[in-house]
Amino acid sequence: LGRIAAERGLMWDVHCDETDDPMSRHVETMAREVTRYGLGVRAAGSHLTSMHSMDNYYVSKLLPLIAESGMTAIPNPLINITLQGRHDTYPKRRGLTRVKEMQAHGITVGWGQDCVMDPWYSLGTADMLDVAFMGLHVAQMTHPAEMARCFTMVTENNARIMGLEGYGLKV
């Protein structure tokens, strides 16, 4: 799929590693394919929840690989916290990828919501402020600067991920 996207000048969004399995390595493969085909920011990995279960050493190698590829990330906090960790007793995983760590590596991250009133998540409203609100809680991004970043994630970052130019208001 990455090759086809590159050949046709298309964007490539993969719902990738949406699992609790710490051994899932699809995002690593995706990052390598993004680099191989030169897709960069035209490629987005959605969910990436396996990273919440991966050991820190592996993630310390994975995040630079993702950053070098130029691909972006789209965690979906509402559905991810509902589906992931569902079979855990306690401690229970939050079901969200490593948002702050990705940002620290310069990876563009935009909050998403891919389930709106469907069998997986019947509570979706398609309101990105709801998504940002939940995301900042689950990712523990409650410092004022982090909260501001959460709202940038549903506006400017998502526009960048979608390839929209001239988005936003400037004074």
What are these regions (language model features)?
Residues 72, 80-81, 85:
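Active-site clefts of carbohydrate-active enzymes
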Residues 1-44, 50-72, 89-111, 167:
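Histidine/acidic residue-rich metal-binding segments in metalloenzymes
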Residues 23-25, 85-86, 121-122:
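Short Asp/Glu-rich motifs
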Residues 18-20, 49-51, 77-81, 115-117:
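Active-site-proximal loop/turn and secondary-structure-junction residues that shape catalytic pockets
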Residues 50, 71, 78, 137, ...:
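Residue-level marker of positions within ordered structural domains that often coincide
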Residues 11, 32-43, 82-83, 93-171:
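His/Asp/Glu-enriched, well-ordered alpha-helical/loop segment
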